[in-house]
């Protein structure tokens, strides 16, 4: 009688389930959709601040991409007119630097703030859903596994939400910078990016290796968390049966399996990341060699050569970030599937 009364009171006190309820901030209920599309309702709830964030990032990118062109013009004017004409460009470059700093600071601040807020929304969503699941769910799923999904898995998604847009903006800068390079000198621009298709091939191979290892690593992190949580919760039982040595052995085996998968993941990154980051830097050697020869021959000016050097540094940024973002994408994909396994459980308390 008392237990039934408490159950009725508990159900009455709980708010309606927000996970799949229409109009609520939750995940998409269609399990056949791509994992990113299932998270769209959470992203849509922050669409205003996200739009402001991307607007600041794009405007700051336009300013940044325009700097080498202004610098090119300033150097050419200074070489043609040594007596003057340079001070105006100095003030323009100073103003562009201040504007780029302010816009990029605002963009990064708002982006990370939005990512953390979405992480908070997802944590709250999982917490409210866990309070509505039947006891049979906790009989099937270990407590350490639940803790891992509610912490490290959500953290993986938050990191992708923070660094994914950063990489997208860097990729946009590559497109814009390459377009400006083509407008200056087509053969030199094509020679500079000749090695980029190889970077794409390496990135695809890295993705194929990283995803299964990320999935296994996340699961084994949950296994270690489960062993630790069970021993903390059942300390008295372990001591009563003098099972300390047995539990230490269980933890050692779980940690060994985690070490193997984590080491394999690092090894996969180490085989591909150096090449992915180094190949774009060969473009600088092409600019110095081929571009220097063109400058000596009088086909391009010194300002053009400096602008190309600046653009080469700019277009190498997305490739330096590519390995990290690919790893975070694979980890977030694996983590989202583990989180959806909880959120897709039918609650008994409505």
Describe each PLM feature range.
Residues 3-6, 10, 50-103, 182-187, ...:
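Transmembrane helix-loop-helix hairpins at lipid-water interfaces of multipass membrane proteins
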């Amino acid at each position: 009688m008392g237990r039934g009364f408490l159950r009725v009171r508990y159900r009455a006190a709980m708010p309606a389930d927000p996970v799949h309820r229409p109009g609520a901030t939750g995940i998409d209920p269609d399990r056949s959709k791509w994992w990113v599309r299932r998270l769209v309702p959470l992203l849509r709830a922050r669409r205003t601040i996200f739009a402001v964030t991307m607007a600041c990032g794009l405007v700051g990118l336009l300013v940044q991409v325009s700097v080498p062109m202004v610098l090119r013009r300033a150097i050419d004017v200074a070489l043609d007119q040594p007596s003057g004409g340079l001070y105006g460009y100095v003030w323009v470059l100073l103003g562009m630097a201040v504007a780029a700093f302010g816009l990029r600071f605002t963009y990064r601040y708002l982006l990370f703030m939005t990512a953390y807020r979405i992480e908070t929304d997802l944590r709250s969503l999982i917490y409210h859903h866990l309070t509505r699941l039947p006891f049979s769910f906790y009989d099937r799923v270990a407590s350490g596994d639940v803790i891992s999904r509610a912490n490290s898995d959500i953290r993986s998604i938050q990191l992708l939400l923070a660094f994914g847009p950063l990489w997208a903006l860097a990729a946009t800068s590559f497109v814009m910078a390459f377009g400006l390079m083509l407008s200056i000198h087509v053969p030199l621009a094509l020679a500079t990016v000749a090695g980029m298709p190889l970077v794409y091939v390496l990135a695809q191979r890295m993705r194929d290796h990283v995803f299964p290892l990320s999935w296994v690593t996340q699961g084994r992190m949950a296994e270690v968390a489960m062993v630790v949580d069970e021993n903390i919760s059942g300390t008295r039982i372990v001591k009563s049966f003098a099972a300390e040595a047995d539990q230490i052995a269980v933890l050692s085996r779980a940690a060994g399996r985690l070490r193997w998968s984590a080491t394999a993941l690092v090894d996969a990154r180490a085989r591909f990341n150096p090449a992915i980051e180094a190949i774009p830097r060969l473009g600088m050697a092409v600019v110095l060699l081929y571009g220097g020869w063109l400058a000596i021959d009088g086909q391009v000016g010194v300002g053009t050569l400096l602008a190309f050097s600046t653009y080469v540094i700019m277009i190498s940024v997305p490739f330096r970030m590519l390995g990290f973002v690919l790893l975070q994408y694979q980890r977030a994909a694996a983590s989202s599937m583990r989180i959806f396994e909880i959120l897709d459980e039918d609650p008994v308390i409505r």
